[in-house]
């Protein structure tokens, strides 16, 4: 696994959120709260992070975020469709969040793994400015390594997205 600038320091990312006066909410499955935990020590986080919900099991995804049983049955709990519903459900429950991030994936063997979706497949949805940005990626290593890679991937995508969309997001107030 290559070294990441994010695992130990999320300051540049949080500075972007602060600069644009944006808030963040997370729905984490395969990362088990790691994304929020690594953001927590960052200066300014209390002005950015509204909360994080860990919805590891399909039942939690359904009960806490409103993911439909049909989506899970058709596509599995670890799919882009489920991740999208997680992000949208999070936004429905917490509309004050400017950015909603959801993550699911396979960091270990299980019944959802297939040749088309092997262990290491991770799905991320970032909902911002009424648009869902979907990502599917693949990681290698043990479960903890894959969780860290997924967290780093989320930090990287958020940084790139906020930088790219800066004219669309809330301007800094004087």
Functional labels for PLM-detected ranges:
Residues 1-174:
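Short alpha-helical segments enriched in small residues
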